[in-house]
Amino acid sequence: MAKKFNYKLPSMVALTLVGSAVTAHQVQAAETTQDQTTNKNVLDSNKVKATTEQAKAEVKNPTQNISGTQVYQDPAIVQPKTANNKTGNAQVSQKVDTAQVNGDTRANQSATTNNTQPVAKSTSTTAPKTNTNVTNAGYSLVDDEDDNSENQINPELIKSAAKPAALETQYKTAAPKAATTSAPKAKTEATPKVTTFSASAQPRSVAATPKTSLPKYKPQVNSSINDYIRKNNLKAPKIEEDYTSYFPKYAYRNGVGRPEGIVVHDTANDRSTINGEISYMKNNYQNAFVHAFVDGDRIIETAPTDYLSWGVGAVGNPRFINVEIVHTHDYASFARSMNNYADYAATQLQYYGLKPDSAEYDGNGTVWTHYAVSKYLGGTDHADPHGYLRSHNYSYDQLYDLINEKYLIKMGKVAPWGTQSTTTPTTPSKPTTPSKPSTGKLTVAANNGVAQIKPTNSGLYTTVYDKTGKATNEVQKTFAVSKTATLGNQKFYLVQDYNSGNKFGWVKEGDVVYNTAKSPVNVNQSYSIKPGTKLYTVPWGTSKQVAGSVSGSGNQTFKASKQQQIDKSIYLYGSVNGKSGWVSKAYLVDTAKPTPTPTPKPSTPTTNNKLTVSSLNGVAQINAKNNGLFTTVYDKTGKPTKEVQKTFAVTKEASLGGNKFYLVKDYNSPTLIGWVKQGDVIYNNAKSPVNVMQTYTVKPGTKLYSVPWGTYKQEAGAVSGTGNQTFKATKQQQIDKSIYLFGTVNGKSGWVSKAYLAVPAAPKKAVAQPKTAVKAYTVTKPQTTQTVSKIAQVKPNNTGIRASVYEKTAKNGAKYADRTFYVTKERAHGNETYVLLNNTSHNIPLGWFNVKDLNVQNLGKEVKTTQKYTVNKSNNGLSMVPWGTKNQVILTGNNIAQGTFNATKQVSVGKDVYLYGTINNRTGWVNAKDLTAPTAVKPTTSAAKDYNYTYVIKNGNGYYYVTPNSDTAKYSLKAFNEQPFAVVKEQVINGQTWYYGKLSNGKLAWIKSTDLAKELIKYNQTGMALNQVAQIQAGLQYKPQVQRVPGKWTGANFNDVKHAMDTKRLAQDPALKYQFLRLDQPQNISIDKINQFLKGKGVLENQGAAFNKAAQMYGINEVYLISHALLETGNGTSQLAKGADVVNNKVVTNSNTKYHNVFGIAAYDNDPLREGIKYAKQAGWDTVSKAIVGGAKFIGNSYVKAGQNTLYKMRWNPAHPGTHQYATDVDWANINAKIIKGYYDKIGEVGKYFDIPQYK
């Protein structure tokens, strides 16, 4: 007989919940079917925060600590790779926790050019950093290169040479960009072959290797612009990163880091610049944002390409990278912009393992235009970039041909531009080595380090003399390095398994991330560690070397027995809850009590425990050694923090007894960090920032910081260029006695100490002689710039915008016409008065307008308010700016009429008042005249009362509070969005209901009822019509079945199927909607409620804690687990559940040790009791709770996580209709939904997480 658990979960649901539904004929075939859940990453929304942050770390930080990393070698010294030499997958999948990255880490990577091999999207090139920490202690020559071999010149080396391209990393670097230096080039040396692991090494002289020839690319279309690009060997600039923290991060439909192609756009704005487009996008990202902008000089990536953007409609957004071409106006600039776009597109395709394939004519491929998306996919109606390209006598076909050529160059398939395609070696114009030939001497030394092989590499070498390496899959793993070899200009490491010592071979220095390591030492120390922390099989391990995760709830005890230092980081080996492995010391907390910060004793004893709090305006840096962060100053101990050695703003100080505390917050946002003890920080007084307009000079290489008095952890970039650069300051702040200025230089913004700035020397002016023939005019207005607070509407007919009041002619100001802008500066020049307009976010100056071209009103100060209003039936809509025009309307009057407007602040504009707030999930400004305030209600506060219910947090932009209605002690809900919140108390204050309960991290807090929901429903577009999918189902070879007469099955017709699949109808039914309940999502049902339900259920009684733990550990809905166990065990009474032992292959029910199986795992039909107990014994399930937790792991890994995670998906598979389905009964999902709903009713809960497909 077959195993029960050969069936997938849905069949198990059919067996365990109903037992009567017909399973599909394709059940066995499903065993080999790939996971087809296209929306998996989006649906797993409760973990989206952790997933995206982890994915960011995957791409941005290839290792935990690379401060000792060797950089890539110069392209000239890299050995050639053969066409069949596979070097690993170009897609990076390594998982790294960014918290383990050393603060001084800088990833130095090679610049992207037209002549590169597979490359990363990082761009800086630095000189190699030499690690010479080598010792001969304990060195054995047993495995050295053979020094006694004859010198043999390999004739094959004369026929091939290194491609003029560097092997470059597939990692993206998150390190701040710094000034770069090019590494010196050196010739590759050809060397004789010898056996690898032999006696000793001797020097050899070798011949120089000539270059390899590659075929030239044959253009597929004629293009004078492409020929111009090739002829001039145009280079693409570095890819700049200008990311915005508040942009949303959602996975593509296939997951994080898995785009399916790239879309070509143009900005459709002839007057815009790349900076202007980016600024506008940042202010209007709710409507649209893209991944990158390209013009003739720059490539600026504005959003991480691992996550989708909003640039091409609902169908294309989850699939493609979106890149905008900024308009240029001359031949050369246009050619450069096409070259830049093609290079960026080819880089993305290569980076994500995609090949160029035009979708323009068939709707299938990896390179799309916006027009093609509109034509073939829908969801948008744009037709760019064809019109713009035609205006330059260019076409999409020409651009695609250039992208394809770039891709082939990067892949090493065709000759790079500027090289000769010939078998004759090319003679360089200048010698790259001294006239005296290199000796090619071999040196070998012992090494005690570690290394990780990069995804793109030259392979493993049996000997360092081998011409080519052998492809290896051992990438992105940490190995021990036992030897270093240098042959000519090539350096190699001998890598071996860290734990067994088995040697893998030699790898080139440029193909690894290397770190020095000290020898491990024995320790005997206990630490506390958080649940979920990863353990690794080696120190500095990667995602491929995970030994397990820490289980349990609350901090666990980690007993360390070994310690090793890798570079500057400490790793410990130990055990926790039966699991052993290595972990970074950064994740451990010494269980010994921290020594409290000594407080100076007062001259006389004090017993003053009175709390005093006062406002403060300062800044502080938390010391590396500290007592932690305190939620309140009454807390006995603080919580450990990693926010050390960073500058924060200080808003309050508190004194309690003999202790003094500072309240620190993020300098650039309202996010509160917590209270810290005075002795744990370096504090400085600070004056409030003031606006300035001053130009300075600054030297290249000077660091810019995200905050004044910033640390190395808060670098915003470095000044680029050669010679003194111009720094335009817009803000100034005094910290203690030092002055810091905020400004912009070469497109980068940040804070810098005034000590690094110099005032440019004023040009000498010739003294003008008075001319009696010209009568001087009388100045009646002050000739200085005044700071003002006004607001202005630009008239349709205006004289234009000026960068300075001194400009004689203005630029066209048509795009600002009929729009409202803030006014921050005013200046008289001659007889004219000009004002400086800022964009709607207040912080980006646009330019100067003559007041004659504006309607100007005074602007008051913004005042906080908390009030609900009803929008009048007749209103002017929701606007982006107070006193906004029709061109700045977010929602029209009809869209918000008679709706509820939640105001958060207000401002006066002339005699009118405008309120800022939220309506219909959009935020903006409404004129107070368009609002009606509710009847005033006398403030009331009800007493807090007990209230037990588990809600779901629905507003990640909301806050949780230490006390209800507090404006200060509030913290962001972003990290807890879509997670359960177990409520224990309810209180109403001034009409607002507050709930007090436990967050998912165990912290107790108050949350507004408006930020919570009883259930979280998500809708997913299938992209198909209901009639279409119903037709597919009805036309299957194995017809869907229906019982029109009880017990008699007949084939279902089209109408039967359509009725059963209609998600709109099903979602309205309170019971049937449970077929959309996510079975892979626990919902934190209280242990008490579970135990009440399990009362009288045999051995399952009082096992609520075990079911709760199992659900949390393995991500399974508790109610499903319980229902499965109840049916398998006959309500907890079966012998398999009550337990037994198997002795001499016989079942013994009265043994002292009994083994339990509550899910029927491996209970084969021929002898279910014996086989089930045998499996439980092998698994170690000697208690019922172990059987519950262990069995849940099996079910979660084998069934629930298989992809189709709701009953509806199991039955109908809306992602791929007609395939991989688990039942033929059209009512199968309905029947099971009612059963699960019944269990929920008995427990006294409701389902929390629903995922509902939608059809066109």
UniProtKB/Swiss-Prot annotation:
GO terms for cellular component: extracellular region. Residues 199-775 are annotated as: N-acetylmuramoyl-L-alanine amidase. It is an enzyme of class 3 (hydrolase). Undergoes proteolytic processing to generate the two extracellular lytic enzymes, probably at the septal region on the cell surface. Residues 103-138 have a biased composition (Polar residues). Residues 443-517, 519-593, 612-686, 688-762, 784-859, 861-936, 943-1017 form the GW domain. The keyword Ribosomal protein does not apply. SUPFAM superfamilies: N-acetylmuramoyl-L-alanine amidase-like (SSF55846), Prokaryotic SH3-related domain (SSF82057). The keyword Repeat applies. SMART domains: Ami_2, LYZ2. Residues 172-196, 421-439 have a biased composition (Low complexity). Keywords: Cell wall biogenesis/degradation, Hydrolase, Multifunctional enzyme, Repeat, Secreted, Signal. In the N-terminal section; belongs to the N-acetylmuramoyl-L-alanine amidase 2 family. In the C-terminal section; belongs to the glycosyl hydrolase 73 family. Oligomer; forms a ring structure at the cell surface which is important for efficient partitioning of daughter cells after cell division. The GW domains are responsible for directing the proteins to the septal region. This is Bifunctional autolysin. It comes from Staphylococcus aureus (strain COL).
